[in-house]
Amino acid sequence: STVVFVIPDIVKGGNQPTSHRKVAIRACLDELYAAGVEKKDVLLLFSNGLHPRATVPEMKTILGPELFQEFYPTGQITSHDSEDYKHLVDLGYTPQGDHVILNKYVYDADVAILIGHTQGNPYGGYSGGYKHCATGITHWRSISAHHVPQVMHRQDFVPVSTSSEMRHKFDQQGMYMEEKMGKKFFCCDAVLDTQNRQIEINSGWAKQMQPVSWKTADKRTYVHWAKKKYDVVVFGMPTKFHYGDGMGTNPIQMMQALSAQVIRHKRVLADRCVFIVSSICDGWFHEERW
């Protein structure tokens, strides 16, 4: 059997020796090898979606030296390329009209494993589950069905929730992929704390596993019971940013980051609250990457 691990990029999840990606991949490999899967039939695929493709140093940081050396020299680590049409499969349209174009490595594999994180996210409530495959291993046409004003300006987008139209689209696209592939994703998602440590790990079919993860994550992420509203928010904008260094000084990307904070904290913000944000603003926008 051939197996593809779908792994989040550098944006989320932590890189400590006990990070979810490092621990979960190794645990899954042990089970796969015990079941007769051969190492040569395993591929590690970073699910960067439309983010910059994972660099080799990022791959090594995320996986750790042991996993990296185990698979990289034999060409068994790669990063999703949303413009490489030789490695994309057009699955057609969901009943709701979303165009789904999927990574071919995932489509062709006998087993597709999503290693994900249940972390609070302004887009659809939480990362992980079907959000992982709908955003990480598709094409701009697929992503343009949900990361667009028609979805993000709806009344159900703010405050953040798992019942928004955006979340529904993630689920619809993910289940449509499963239907067309003829197999279900095996999801292994960790609910993480502020330091990216595992609080709880849930594995199985995303449709059944997501709500279980959300129940635990809700206890620390979205304080539905909060009553007090705040007038002022103060925070610093880092130069080193998880999407790429330089975002904290680029005014366009700064505004995107600010709007995400509004979405995240809307439940506890006064209607006319003020954001005070410090930034170096030294003019470095990291042009060599962006």
Regions found by a protein language model. Name each.
Residues L43-P57, S82-H87, N196:
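Short, conserved secondary-structure transition motifs
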